[in-house]
Regions:
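Terminal targeting signals and extreme-terminal segments of soluble enzymes
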Residues: 1-126
Length: 126
């Protein structure tokens, strides 16, 4: 079952994310797009797509270590478009974990269509 993970700060201000654990290495997260997430062309702003991926994948890293990790790299490929009212579902998968690093893959979808994919590395802080 999804639970709200946005208690304070940037993501709460921007609509929040709900999150759920699928397995020890896989997580899902979701949000619904609002008008203020759109760019001048009426599509979701790329910066917000990046924020959803960073927040969802970062929260997944935090869950795996039960601590804090920060983004070192995040490589995003924009594939499709979305609009206000769309529910965005994010998927995060832990590919490898060392004592100090977490390597992940992510994907965002709406209505079964891929919007973006990502690969990233998170540094374990504590």
């Amino acid at each position: 079952e999804f639970r709200n993970i946005s208690k304070v700060g940037y993501m709460l201000h921007n609509g929040g994310l709900e999150f759920k654990k699928i397995s020890e290495t896989e997580y899902e997260y979701r949000t619904t797009l609002k008008d203020f997430h759109m760019n001048a062309a009426g599509m979701t702003h790329g910066g917000f797509i990046m924020s959803i991926l960073d927040s969802g994948m970062g929260t997944s890293a935090h869950q795996v270590i039960d601590g804090v990790a920060v983004t070192i790299t995040l490589d995003i490929k924009f594939i499709g478009a979305s609009k206000a009212g769309d529910e965005i579902i994010g998927y995060a998968k832990i590919k490898k974990q060392t004592k100090s690093l977490i390597f992940m893959q992510g994907e965002l979808k709406t209505s079964g269509r891929t919007l973006a994919t990502a690969e990233g590395i998170w540094k374990v802080i504590k």
